[in-house]
Amino acid sequence: MGNNGVIVIKENQMLHVFTETAPTLSEAQKLVGGLVEMVRSPTDPEIQILVNEEGLLRGLPFNEEASRLCDTGIVGDAIILKGEAKWT
């Protein structure tokens, strides 16, 4: 992904790479299918992961690719932000 960027990883493993501009809250909610929760990668402080806040409660499927990239368990669709694309 380089130093900056946005990647959306659907639960079915399809990758959608965006520009270096982070999505708006409304765009993020549409991409994750509900309320957005931001989690941080436990191993890389430059990575933020936007997920569905109710993903575990709703039983969303495990997202293997997002979990691998972020080194933490992720369910449902995920938006990965890095560098200048991070939310402040």
Question: What is each model feature region?
Answer:
Residues G2-T88:
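Detector for the mature cores of small, proteolytically processed
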